[in-house]
Amino acid sequence: MAKRCAAGEGELQGNEEMISPAKKLCTSAVSGLRRIAVEGNIAAGKSTFLRLLKESSPAYHVISEPITKWQNVDSPGDSVTASQQCGGNLLDMFYREPKRWAYTFQTYACLSRLKAQLRQLPQEVASQPNSTIFFERSVHSDKLVFAENCHDSGLLSDVEWNIYCDWHSFLLESLPLHFDAFIYLKTTPQTTWERMQKRGRPEEQDVALDYLKSLHEKHEKWLLDSENKMK
């Protein structure tokens, strides 16, 4: 069972080959490799925390959140996807018309994250003994925090939520992603809202504090409730 640990609020500011099932998609099969997911609210300081970790040791490798895919921006080393060729900033579309785009965004966010987290590790990482790979969020928070919050707030219908849960469970059973631990960057909703305004990401300028409060409650329930189990 993966370990969970919470980090208190600090001063943080703001063509690769896919591994085939035959190679066991769970890359923790690499000897000595540890896989840790860093979780937290929007603007909790995850990117800064991960950058500091990466700079602190050559044994640390970071898989960042694929947000550029959601913004329709071609990031270095990635090919342009069919959705990008069609145009559209899906992150912005979700924030502007959440009920219309909730299912589309939550589906694509999870699938793009899954793709990023299943890429074959660089040789220098895979060959290094006792290395650790840190992930900016996981497919578990995609479901248990963001998608579930959309359902609870009425942005996802019962039918959409049931379909989401069905394919999400199937993918995790078919493409196992084991995590050895979860690090939770616990930050107050007010602080994350202030940081979000400060960093000035255009899509986030109208995000309400109440939305961050709801996400905070979901993180607390998932990561700090000892009775809760990942499904």
Region locations from a protein language model:
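P-loop (Walker A) phosphate-binding loop of NTP-binding proteins
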Residues: 41
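Extreme N-terminal, non-catalytic leader segments
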Residues: 1-34, 68, 74-76
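Conserved substrate/cofactor phosphate-moiety recognition/catalytic segment
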Residues: 55-105, 148
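Post-Walker A alpha-helix
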Residues: 49-50, 54
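Glycine-rich phosphate-binding loop used to anchor ATP phosphates in small-molecule kinases
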Residues: 97-178
